[in-house]
């Protein structure tokens, strides 16, 4: 399993044959040696919203987007919101920017996505906002071997972290870069790394609560036009679970099968 490198020391040296090499001392204590002749460029990145004290894996979706993953209890979750624009079989998901068209999906039961404020720069790190028809579609929007979690699977996550009264804080990234001025109770001790990416309203099709709230779809339907979601906010450590109509715009976190 690939891992995200969160800390390393890079040194240039010579091998026994006199070849220039790069010594990479990883934060797990191991040494990786790479000949400089094999290196075209070096890119160092640190996802500051992750928990640097935990080990992350990776998963790649059907569009080639790679996400960190984290084991929490017996479950393995994506540690970022989904960014794909297709279902797992390659079928495209509509990008709906117009608020009226966004609301009208209830009459057609059509899956759709949008960026917050229709601004593609929010794709990373916040992800795409999807409607509920995407989350419940049998074609599966998650990568192969992963799925949109059910209400009960979210309950399992919350219970492992101490219950709905405190689990939200353990899911939220720390600080106020991605949560505005409050982020009360945000510890990210789980490594889930939730960010305050906002919502798309199912009442007017507009965008609200950026840096203040994050909602995720479950695959558990209430009716053919509504489903359960889970949510965290900047004002406390709670995890909220409730139902909403499928023309709301929420994020998706995938769970390994």
Language-model segment annotations:
Residues 1-24:
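Bacterial Sec-dependent N-terminal signal peptides
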Residues 4, 28, 154-155:
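Short intrinsically disordered, low-complexity coil segments enriched in acidic
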Residues 11, 21-23, 33, 76, ...:
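Ordered hydrophobic segments in well-structured contexts
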Residues 11-17, 32, 141, 185:
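Generic structural signal for beta-strand residues in well-ordered domains
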Residues 19, 36-40, 72-75:
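Short, solvent-exposed coil/turn segments at beta-strand boundaries
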Residues 20-35, 58-62:
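Short N-terminal segments immediately surrounding and downstream of signal-peptide cleavage
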Residues 26-48, 252:
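N-terminal targeting signals for Sec/Tat export/insertion, comprising classic cleavable signal peptides
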Residues 46-257:
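Conserved positions within compact, well-structured domain cores
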